[in-house]
Amino acid sequence: FVPIFTHSELQKIREKERNKGQ
């Protein structure tokens, strides 16, 4: 697996997932 996402991108995606969970 090659991390094509930057750390900031990952943070954004994670926040989106968290919002979806709520």
UniProtKB/Swiss-Prot annotation:
It holds the Pfam family Motilin_ghrelin. The gene is MLN. The keyword Metal-binding does not apply. One of its GO terms (molecular function) is hormone activity. Belongs to the motilin family. Keywords: Hormone, Secreted. GO terms for cellular component: extracellular region. It is found in: Secreted. Its main location: secreted. InterPro entries: Motilin_ghrelin. It comes from the Eukaryota. Residues 9-22 have a biased composition (Basic and acidic residues). Residues 1-22 are annotated as: Disordered. This is Motilin.
